[in-house]
Amino acid sequence: MSKNIYPVPTHIKNTALVDNDKYNKMYKHSIDDPQSFWAEHGKRLDWFTPYSKVKNTTFDKGHINIKWYEDGYLNASYNCIDRHLKTKANKVALIWEGDNPSQSEHITYQKLHDEVAKFANGLKKLGVQKGDRVAIYMPMSPQAIYAMQGCARIGAIHSVIFGGFSPSAIADRIKDSGAKVVITSDEGRRAGNCVPLKANVDEAVLQESVTSIEHVIVHQLTGGDVDWHDHDIWWHDLVADEEPVCEPEVMNAEDPLFILYTSGSTGQPKGVVHTTGGYLVYASMTHEYIFDVKEDDVFWCSADVGWITGHSYIAYGPLVNGCTQVVFEGVPTYPTAGRMGEVVDKHGVTILYTAPTAIRALMAKGDEPVASSHRNSLRILGSVGEPINPEAWNWYYEQIGKSNCPIVDTWWQTETGGIMITPLPGATDLKPGSATRPFFGIAPAIFDAEGNTLEGEADGNLVILDSWPSQARTIYGDHERFEQTYFSTYPGVYFCGDGCRRDEDGYYWITGRVDDVLNISGHRLGTAEIESALVAHPAVAEAAVVGYPHDIKGQGIYVYITPNEGITVSDELTKEIRNWVRKELSPIASPDMIQWSPGLPKTRSGKIMRRILRKIAANEHEQLGDTSTLADPSVVDELIENRLNR
């Protein structure tokens, strides 16, 4: 735990939206009287029919029900675009920065409106209606935003699938959502390489078990060769004759806006459902207050729209607030490690929101990341995706921000819809590695394993005591799983699945997942999902997957495999297994270390003792603890002897 404290800088405090006194006052109001607090802040949106009901929620066992602004009517796309046209039609909404540094495009709010309206009309022409699900598998192009906003405009529910996922992962998500349309590009571009997006979609939708797809819309990005099928249609042909006018569908606040799949510990991805009203209130409010957003700011969130960060802090929050933002197709180290700083200078970025993984990757490059840029425009820095270690925090603060920019280290989840625990730039003294204090309306607590509340300085499991507007409403098609996953461990509260420590100043420190979900470079992957892919390989009898500390990615993937009888283990087989997982799941899921073993440590009831595997993977085998329940303790000796992470 870092002992250093960084006070709020005077130059930030003097102009900030919220200072410490205002934070304390607003926070108290939000907890003491959430009804009046959120009634007031719901007015930040434009409503076709104003709400009279604000909060109607219960976490009671068997009756989990979450509703906010339930009698209000609005449209997400209208709030992101149309309401700005009277005063900001010519303001830049999106600055698209290509993978190739020579490519960029400025898109005004008027142009955004016109492109979204034309695409929305195209969707309607294909028979897409309110409530239909639409899958989106695209690179970080303006068209990805047009697609999301186009769906929202007509009331279709989008399900964005990260462009790094494999055909089988795409197919699983399409089958679960029942999507009738997929939107993709011919290819994506990443670090100078082409990514076969259309080919992956083809492989997914041509599976016999995928029966719901009626159309595949293809945006031509690279001009690369693609196979063509009867259900395919080019984006440019779809919108060619469409007018740039499309009346926004009137949506109830509780109508679903999107489904976003996230890894579950059981192996089957969970379709997290977010609705329209409360989600937009919270996404836009957190964006404004946490990043201290002003009219002339240029915001850059470096996430992908395939993840929740790209939904809340690219596709929705900043646009609701009428902000100018960078949409980045590339990676921060291509073509050189100086790229991130160069993009900041090129577009005058004032607020940068990125992940510890990117920061650690840049740290490893010495002076190169900062040598080619001055970054004088930066005012606020942010971190997202996983806890940031103090070393990376200090480097980010000193090197990227020149010791002049507060860092908002934000903790939240796909299921929370928006940032939950975070500093506010003008209100919070910073401690490197701490997410600090809860945002307005968030009531965190720390429980021990038995569900007792821990007061004061404490270390345990993080829970949230009451609902907030952007909370996920359910898991698509499986409300029972929603209740089981988030509300059964500690009945009556929301269980985050994260360990947490609270220090003597009341600051919160997130210590990582307590379930079988890994956090790889800020991407959540279920160990069960990876294990399922591994045991599908004919050479694998049994597999166990654990995380271990990784200098760049935060967590690495360590795999223990027992081969089938008669299988000869070799470097070639190890390489084949690694590529197998890449193909079955995603390159992100590719194992960092693969240890072959004649057996795995199991209890007498046959349960694999993952605690022991985690200790060995982390090279902490001296701290194994009690092994008395093992069926065969000699297995552990063999695993320690042949461990890979020394």
Curated annotation (Swiss-Prot):
Name of this protein: Acetyl-coenzyme A synthetase
NCBIfam families tied to this protein: Ac_CoA_lig_AcsA (TIGR02188), PRK00174.1 (NF001208)
Amino-acid positions noted as binding Mg(2+) in the UniProt annotation, renumbered to this chain: 535, 537, 540
Record-listed ATP binding positions: 385-387, 409-414, 498, 513, 524
Family statement: Belongs to the ATP-dependent AMP-binding enzyme family.
Catalytic reaction annotation: acetate + ATP + CoA = acetyl-CoA + AMP + diphosphate
Stated role: Catalyzes the conversion of acetate into acetyl-CoA (AcCoA), an essential intermediate at the junction of anabolic and catabolic pathways. AcsA undergoes a two-step reaction. In the first half reaction, AcsA combines acetate with ATP to form acetyl-adenylate (AcAMP) intermediate. In the second half reaction, it can then transfer the acetyl group from AcAMP to the sulfhydryl group of CoA, forming the product AcCoA.
Lineage: superkingdom: Bacteria
PTM summary: Acetylated. Deacetylation by the SIR2-homolog deacetylase activates the enzyme.
Cellular component terms (Gene Ontology): cytosol
Entry keyword annotation includes Lipid metabolism: no
Acetylation keyword on record: yes
Names of the cofactor(s): Mg(2+)
Protein source organism: Pseudoalteromonas translucida (strain TAC 125)
Residues modified to N6-acetyllysine: 607
Keywords noted in UniProt: Acetylation, ATP-binding, Ligase, Magnesium, Metal-binding, Nucleotide-binding
Transmembrane residue ranges: none
Pfam families on file: ACAS_N, AMP-binding, AMP-binding_C
Binding site for CoA: 190-193, 309, 521, 582
